[in-house]
From Swiss-Prot:
Similarity-based family: Belongs to the HrcA family.
Known function: Negative regulator of class I heat shock genes (grpE-dnaK-dnaJ and groELS operons). Prevents heat-shock induction of these operons.
Record keywords: Repressor, Stress response, Transcription, Transcription regulation
InterPro entries (alphabetical): GAF-like_dom_sf (IPR029016), HrcA (IPR002571), HrcA_C (IPR021153), WH-like_DNA-bd_sf (IPR036388), WH_DNA-bd_sf (IPR036390), WHTH_transcript_rep_HrcA_IDD (IPR023120)
GO MF annotations in UniProt: DNA binding
HAMAP family documented for this protein: HrcA (MF_00081)
Stated name of the protein: Heat-inducible transcription repressor HrcA
Organism per entry: Bacillus cereus (strain AH820)
Any GO BP: negative regulation of DNA-templated transcription
One Pfam short name: HrcA
Keyword Transmembrane assigned: no
């Protein structure tokens, strides 16, 4: 159990190192307003903290830096919520204020904004479309031969694609088809749509649509949409701006992992509900052993729909990042309920 004095010194060391990226010595601590102890007392307490494994020496300086154990204790016991500036709150809320909530577009923009606000790498795993349910479908004619099919799901995902309208299918047929599809398919999981259309809907359409065969062929192409979740990155190269990653050899494997993207599917897919912080070697990938990954899930009720994560150095602004992720996931969840 750490004493109050040790807790204060440990917190001050970590806060200073997060801000400066420079090892912290007793002289630096003695100049802090919140530290009222003598240099000798500070040195003794730092020696004890080092012996306990919370801080460690560096090869190039007489100062100390936090260890993984130190960061873990800091996150679990010393972290205080950070109030975000009003302009950042407004910027984030504006992103989610559009009347039509397009989850895919929002996920992409969220990754970009988060990377700009943190100067770290932001990763957003969008909702898995196969678990979405159809809300409605629209077919909007552009001219006599082409139209745009718009598929909207219950989570706000909007999928649009240009389709060719056969000459034998007129506007009244299109209107009848859309009405039947919305009446019969609203609430059906996206993964079941194709089977439902060709097992049940075709029979209904046969009685209402004149050029039935051409209409069915057009429908087949309309509902062929990718069902797996998409992953979006913002600030892929931001790690290079961090002092600890100026050595390209040190960061090469991490940049390769970020660029390939696939490994992050598995990492983010299986996240537990809520905020999770993985520090250094707590991460399963060896390329991330000098990084921290903070992730947050967004959901509707009990259904977890996706994950937002920030990847940065272990010397990360934990409090700020957690506050940002909490705001984003709250806005994302509210948007999906629209």
């Amino acid at each position: 159990m750490l004493t109050e004095r040790q807790l204060l010194i440990l917190q001050t060391i970590i806060d200073d190192f997060i801000g400066s990226a420079q090892p912290v010595g007793s002289r630096t601590l003695a100049k802090k307003d919140e530290i009222t102890y003598s240099s000798a007392t500070i040195r003794n307490e730092m020696a004890d903290l080092e012996e306990l494994g919370f801080i460690e020496k560096t090869h190039s300086s007489s100062g100390r830096v936090p260890s993984e154990k130190g960061y873990r204790f800091y996150v679990d016991h010393l972290l205080a919520p950070q109030n975000l500036p009003n302009d950042e709150i407004v910027q984030i809320k504006d992103l989610f204020a559009e009347r039509i909530f397009e989850a895919e577009k929002i996920a992409q923009q969220s990754a970009q904004i988060l990377s700009e606000l943190t100067n770290y790498t932001a990763i957003v795993l969008g909702p898995k479309l196969s678990t979405n349910k159809l809300k409605n479908v629209q077919i909007v004619p552009l001219d006599r031969q082409t139209a745009v099919a718009i598929i909207v799901t219950d989570t706000g995902h909007v999928q649009s694609k240009t389709i060719t309208v056969p000459e034998s299918v007129d506007l009244s047929d299109l209107e009848k088809m859309v009405n039947i599809l919305n009446e019969k398919l609203s609430g059906v999981p996206m993964s079941e749509l194709h089977n439902k259309i060709f097992k049940e809907i075709v029979t209904v359409l046969r009685g209402y649509v004149h050029n039935y065969d051409s209409a069915i062929k057009m429908l087949d192409g309309t509902f062929q949409v990718p069902l797996s979740e998409k992953i979006y990155f913002g600030g892929k190269a931001n790690m290079l701006s961090q002092p600890e990653f100026h050595d390209i050899h040190k960061v090469r494997s991490l940049l390769t992992m970020i660029d390939n993207e696939a490994e992050f599917y598995d990492i983010l897919r299986h996240k537990q509900v809520g905020i999770q912080v993985k520090i250094g070697r707590e991460n399963s990938a060896t390329a991330m052993e000098d990084c921290s990954l903070i992730s947050a899930t967004y959901s509707i009720g009990e259904e977890q729909l996706g994950t937002i994560a920030i990847l940065g150095p272990t010397r990360m602004q934990y409090s700020r990042v957690i506050s940002l992720l909490q705001l984003f996931t709250r806005q994302f969840t509210d948007g999906l309920k629209k």
